[in-house]
Amino acid sequence: MKNRIVLFACLLLLTGLLVGCSVSVDDEIKNTTAKIEEAFNNKPMETNKSFESISYYLPNAMKIESEGTNNLIFEQGKQLYILFVNPNEELDSKVMFESTGAKTKKDLVFETFEDENRFGYVKVTEVEENSYEVLVGIGGIKLTTQAKASQISESAEQMMQIVSSVKY
């Protein structure tokens, strides 16, 4: 009987620690919106990579997986990122944003940002349990990945840094 009580107490303590230490999806969503807006408003990162007529900033932790016409695929650990650049669209274009479709019930984040010369956006959609599609764009530039709940805000911020840096 005493062993059961000790086991139950340990399980209860472990459950409390796991729940208390995990970041909630709601917190990640709040962080995502704030980080994206800040990254959009910050000075663009200096470009450090180029392919054909596109130059861009790529964080040191990311590697180039493949390069194709208007598409680049990056990898960070097991997470893939797909960058699409439409050089026919200006930085204030809304065509790519409108192609993402209207806001749905599955969208946890669906925000837009504007300044004098640019139109930016972020969309986070749950695709399955603990897996979210993160889409960040400015004008004719769009970067997409799938992330776990705990990676949403960090991924989105990094993505906006990349997208903001793209020159074509």
Go through each PLM region and give its residues.
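Bacterial N-terminal signal peptides that target proteins for export
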Residues: 1-8
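C-terminal motif of bacterial Sec signal peptides marking the signal peptidase cleavage site
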Residues: 16-20
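Bacterial signal peptide processing site
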Residues: 22-25
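Post-signal peptide N-terminal segment of mature Sec-exported envelope proteins
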Residues: 30-48
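Short, hydrophobic/aromatic-rich segments at coil-to-beta transitions
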Residues: 41-46, 70-71, 114-123
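Secretory pathway targeting signatures of secreted, lumenal, and periplasmic proteins
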Residues: 48-97
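Signature of long, low-cysteine stretches enriched in small and polar/charged residues
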Residues: 101-153
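Surface-exposed amphipathic alpha-helical segments
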Residues: 145-168
